[in-house]
Amino acid sequence: MRDKIKLESSAGTGHFYTTTKNKRTMPGKLEIKKFDPVARKHVVYKETKLK
């Protein structure tokens, strides 16, 4: 089953993306480099719980 997750910017801007992840095949926390439009550069986004 795919669960919804929130990818939060590590730049401290408060920007986030939402996506889904298969917890059976990827049990660890997800870290992806994506574009932060507030900081206007690519930064690391870390997985947090979607409330």
Swiss-Prot record:
Any GO molecular function: structural constituent of ribosome
GO BP of this protein: translation
Gene name of the record: rpmG
Keywords tagged on the record: Ribonucleoprotein, Ribosomal protein
The protein's name: Large ribosomal subunit protein bL33
Family recorded in the similarity comment: Belongs to the bacterial ribosomal protein bL33 family.
A GO CC term assigned to this protein in UniProt: cytosolic large ribosomal subunit
Lineage, top ranks: Bacteria, Pseudomonadati, Pseudomonadota, Betaproteobacteria, Neisseriales
Pfam family, one: Ribosomal_L33
Sequence ranges of Polar residues compositional bias: 10-20
NCBIfam families to which the protein is assigned, alphabetical: PRK00504.1, PRK00595.1, rpmG_bact
Residue span of region Disordered: 1-21
